[in-house]
């Protein structure tokens, strides 16, 4: 009968890691299987969430030829399955050849851990093959290679089998093949070596992901491959292309163009390194104090050691490294670097948004774009803070701790720290992923609860009309109860996470403390070493308590940063051609020659539009809504590029000159004037930001609004409110006219500038506009035909075509569309609409 003895072959909890010309089998088969299982679980955690986010393939069908190469993939599956069975076969071989010998406990643990690690590898192999076929079925191009986690697992497995060769001369291993047991174990090692080597080589080739040929059959009614790509992209894993994201992020770490800030970055990195040294030195001096007290050392030595310890503790802080002098100094110095980074990101985004076309802006919600900008900026600074000053230092502390305990204590202490930290990180990631759904549900319900309250209060009068106060309170109570139920789940899952972390910390501390106590009892370590171990481990676990928060925040920030970079990748539709020069303005002759334009493919907004505006002339564009009148102005201002034809100013194609020079010669008074939430003076000065106060007032006088401005309590310093809502329609139009007068453009574009005003305001503003347009080339879009009767030329536009042109009298005598429009408007002016009659408001 075979029984289980001590964990290792030696007496006591553990023996040395290196003994008898080789690694201790106990140490080796504890380190390797635990490392492999850690890598396998981490790889699964990173891949499986992405699998859940994948969209199932639709009606597309993937031909067999596009599938994986069958024979190599079957071999890969066979080797992965064999690798899973070999550890258990090795344990069975040990049991069969033991014959009354008590088996050490590490053999049982190693067999279980190795098998579980192989299960993770086999699972990943199948999952990635399924994802590859699904991606091909959706017409999404992918790189035919395994995930980094799976490749790393196979690489470390093969490297571990090679590592065993360093113990070739050790009698503890099976290399001598002295008996049946060693012969069996040697044969199993050969199988493991061949298996792991085969998986490593096949993994680099990835036959399960590489198609023989790319043949995609799609049903005719579902040939929108682009749509599938969009869906796939929107659901991509947060950790996908991690290397590219880190490279993009690192570009913001180094403040280019600022030597002083670059020096500060180096100082901050140096301080971060000093913090790592302090985290080692503080427990060491604490150990020395305990040893000196135990040995009853002289007061001078004790006082010096205590003073040094307290000074180091002052530099380090209250045990966590987050409140000490060094950390606070680093935080203080980093403020300028963080501001430089956020300023650079914000300005880059803001500048890019202004470079994008009007078409892009009209197709996006401004609030959504601004959220991307805000979150993108915060994500860059947040990721730099979390990664550089939280995650990397914590991982560095773990590595330093493993190296320190392995070198100055025993390799088993390093192994204990490694196992506990690995288990801690894995469980934190797994539980954090699990509880994410509770947090999402809670946030959704919180928004719904708030929306219900807001909706009820906004409809206060309606609630009173129907006496529904009790009903609204009941609905709100129901929403609160539902929110609190989800809040309980989220909080309870957080408690589970904290208790799981606490359990791992306790188990690690228990194992290390027992081992340390054993070595102290054997007089291999001192009492101070026991204190050092407990202090160092507790200090090490402190920042790890926030690892779950860091993990979620990094995920969120990566998503926000990805959205920001997607925004930066938006192509600028209207660009200056290479070598474009400024517009050379002479007299202001405008020519449209055979212009075609469409906002969307297949729907032409303008068709073969041709006309000429001579210098100083006024041309009016009239016609029904949607005919293309405003489009003509936008094309002249070059908000869009035309599909075909040519637009010239003084004989120069506007697509061949710089946009800024073109627009500097054009002034626009739109139908709906939007003012900035600023003073009246600054809104007028926006026409020419370098203008002085006297020039602003002169422009206001020319626009006929100077006296009205002076009647305000604060005069020109009056705030107009958001979008100018504190001013009347006529006042806003006059501010827009004053702004255009101050710009002093050579060409004026009036887009139904008075259509929304009453008759008295319209006449007054028409007089102001007449002054602005004197001796300037002008194009007017008019809704009321009476405002353009004196135009040099009137163009009647319908369905994107010019159907009539001429002066007012000639068009009336022709009896066409213009004459019909004129007659209808004259009849409308003679009849007072019912809505305009005075109403009894009593």
UniProtKB/Swiss-Prot annotation:
It is an enzyme of class 7 (translocase). ATP binds at residues 599, 623-634. Changing residue 579 to E: Results in retention of the protein in the Golgi apparatus. It is a multi-pass membrane protein. The keyword Metal-binding does not apply. Residues 590-824 form the ABC transporter domain. Induction: Up-regulated during erythroid differentiation and heme biosynthesis. Up-regulated by cellular porphyrins (at protein level). Up-regulated in red blood cells under anemic condition. Induced by sodium arsenite in a dose-dependent manner. Residues 48-72, 128-147, 207-263, 313-375, 419-499, 551-842 are cytoplasmic. Disulfide bonds join 8-26. It is found in: Cell membrane; Mitochondrion outer membrane; Endoplasmic reticulum membrane; Golgi apparatus membrane. SMART domains: AAA. Keywords: ATP-binding, Cell membrane, Disulfide bond, Endoplasmic reticulum, Endosome, Golgi apparatus, Lysosome, Membrane, Mitochondrion, Mitochondrion outer membrane, Nucleotide-binding, Secreted, Translocase, Transmembrane, Transmembrane helix, Transport. Belongs to the ABC transporter superfamily. ABCB family. Heavy Metal importer (TC 3.A.1.210) subfamily. Contains two independently folding units, the N-terminal transmembrane domain (residues 1-205) and the ABC-core domain (206-842) are respectively responsible for the lysosomal targeting and the ATPase activity. This is ATP-binding cassette sub-family B member 6. It comes from Mus musculus.
